[in-house]
Amino acid sequence: MLDVGMTELLCFAIIAILVLGPEKLPEAARFAGRWYVRLKRYITNLQNEIDQELRLSEFRKEMQEELNRIEALERKVQQQLDEIQKQQVSESLEVTETAKTTQKPIWKCTPISGHYKVPYLTKVTSLAAQTDISETSPVELKIAV
């Protein structure tokens, strides 16, 4: 941490003995030890906080990447849904257009003149004279077995 070797410590000890003397040296050593422990604890806490912030930063980055992936997937699904809806609308328009453009067959009927016999009618009439169907009697359907 401080890169202090054994020779440097020995030099500090000799200088401390010369400056402080043998009576005040133990008290100064305790004072220096307390400050050393406080400094070491502070540095350790600072390192832990930095590591925690880095982990949180990495976690936030991973969360943002996942959110970006989810948003991209959501956009893709929305595009597919829009395409399907457009396709359904175009198909329904095609169906209505083909229904409008498809011509119904024209039934051309020409009256037949003369007398004819229609089965299940009670009287003989001419087609040109027959305009109302209410003149016919009810028809019974018989199935041959």
From Swiss-Prot:
Q: Which Pfam families match?
A: TatA_B_E
Provide one Gene Ontology biological process annotation: protein transport by the Tat complex
Keyword Cytoplasm listed: no
Q: What is its main location?
A: membrane
Which protein are we looking at? Sec-independent protein translocase protein TatB
Q: What is the lineage of its organism?
A: Bacteria, Pseudomonadati, Pseudomonadota, Gammaproteobacteria, Moraxellales
According to its record, how does it sit in the membrane? Answer: Single-pass membrane protein
Q: Which UniProt keywords apply?
A: Cell inner membrane, Cell membrane, Membrane, Protein transport, Translocation, Transmembrane, Transmembrane helix, Transport
Q: Where in the cell is it found?
A: Cell inner membrane
Question: How is the quaternary structure described?
Answer: The Tat system comprises two distinct complexes: a TatABC complex, containing multiple copies of TatA, TatB and TatC subunits, and a separate TatA complex, containing only TatA subunits. Substrates initially bind to the TatABC complex, which probably triggers association of the separate TatA complex to form the active translocon.
Q: Name one GO molecular function term.
A: protein transmembrane transporter activity
